[in-house]
């Protein structure tokens, strides 16, 4: 029997490139409702939206979601997740999946996959997903986070830089991917064991996390194991810019 899990969707109003992003209309529904709809199609026993904004709270209540108003001073999404897990009274061995509030096209199967992967790997406190990188532009794009894993699928590190650096190949040609190097892009969906979240918050950010602006590096810094599996379905890009929003509107608006 598959272990039950809870989905938490963080939603912040503030956004440098797209203010009020969770409330942007997509084919008649606010984006946060689109994400919530996808999460409810998963096997999650509970789907909760977490926001620090009264406008988002009201919108979510309007379409019938379970929603919590959280503190506004969290350093990261995982810190916010810990508050939610604590307020919901989730057990230390429970699994919670963090689904980003700007992923209206997220496949429900990936939510189920990351939760099942964590349940199947008791040595890990976190599970996440990745997919192959097929073009050199993505490899050199700092907005595409790269991940390297060991033989057991455990993360060695994450970076915005090309990872690993193909020393010999890139000494000459940087216009194509080197042969035989399985470059992978990290997909930002996580499953956590609830008992780990309090430790994560108590540690506070480390210099490596701050340098790359990647909070998962805090876990690796403290020796926490992160299991990384190849996504079973394609993860379409989320919404970061007005251009992304128009693209998603075209997809969902027919």
Curated annotation (Swiss-Prot):
Keyword Transferase: yes
Keywords of the record: Cytoplasm, Lipopolysaccharide biosynthesis, Nucleotidyltransferase, Transferase
Protein family (similarity comment): Belongs to the KdsB family.
One protein family per Pfam: CTP_transf_3
Species name: Pseudomonas paraeruginosa (strain DSM 24068 / PA7)
Any GO BP annotation: CMP-keto-3-deoxy-D-manno-octulosonic acid biosynthetic process
Enzyme Commission code(s) on record: 2.7.7.38
Catalytic activity from the UniProt record: 3-deoxy-alpha-D-manno-oct-2-ulosonate + CTP = CMP-3-deoxy-beta-D-manno-octulosonate + diphosphate
Main location (coarse class): cytoplasm
Name of the gene encoding the protein in the UniProt record: kdsB
Gene Ontology MF annotations: 3-deoxy-manno-octulosonate cytidylyltransferase activity
PANTHER family: 3-DEOXY-MANNO-OCTULOSONATE CYTIDYLYLTRANSFERASE, 3-DEOXY-MANNO-OCTULOSONATE CYTIDYLYLTRANSFERASE, MITOCHONDRIAL
Gene3D superfamilies linked to this entry: Spore Coat Polysaccharide Biosynthesis Protein SpsA, Chain A (3.90.550.10)
NCBIfam families xref list: kdsB, PRK05450.1-3, PRK05450.1-5, PRK13368.1
Pathway: Nucleotide-sugar biosynthesis; CMP-3-deoxy-D-manno-octulosonate biosynthesis; CMP-3-deoxy-D-manno-octulosonate from 3-deoxy-D-manno-octulosonate and CTP: step 1/1; Bacterial outer membrane biogenesis; lipopolysaccharide biosynthesis
Protein name: 3-deoxy-manno-octulosonate cytidylyltransferase
Nucleotidyltransferase in keyword set: yes
UniProt-listed InterPro entries: Cytidylyl_trans, KdsB, Nucleotide-diphossugar_trans
């Amino acid at each position: 029997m598959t272990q039950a899990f809870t989905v938490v969707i963080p939603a912040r109003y503030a956004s440098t490139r797209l203010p009020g992003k969770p409330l942007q209309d997509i084919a008649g529904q606010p984006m946060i409702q689109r994400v919530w709809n996808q999460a409810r199609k998963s096997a999650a026993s509970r789907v909760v939206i977490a926001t620090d904004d009264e406008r988002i709270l009201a919108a979510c209540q309007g379409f019938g979601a379970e929603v919590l108003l959280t503190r506004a001073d969290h350093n990261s999404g995982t810190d916010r997740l810990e508050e939610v897990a604590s307020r919901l009274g989730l057990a230390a061995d429970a699994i919670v999946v963090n689904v980003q509030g700007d992923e209206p096209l997220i496949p429900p199967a990936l939510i189920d996959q990351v939760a099942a992967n964590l349940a199947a790997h008791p040595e890990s406190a976190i599970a996440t997903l990745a997919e192959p990188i097929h073009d050199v532009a993505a490899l050199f794009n700092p907005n595409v986070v790269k991940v390297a894993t060991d033989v057991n699928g455990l993360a060695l590190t994450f970076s915005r830089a090309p990872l690993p650096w193909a020393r010999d190949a890139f000494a000459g040609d940087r216009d194509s991917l080197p042969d035989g190097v399985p470059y992978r892009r990290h997909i930002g969906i996580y499953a956590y064991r609830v008992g780990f979240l309090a430790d994560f918050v108590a540690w506070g950010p480390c210099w490596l996390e701050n340098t790359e602006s990647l909070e998962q590096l805090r876990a690796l810094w403290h020796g926490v194991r992160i299991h990384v599996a190849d996504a079973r379905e394609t993860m379409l890009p989320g919404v970061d810019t007005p251009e992304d929003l128009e693209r998603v509107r075209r997809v969902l608006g027919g």
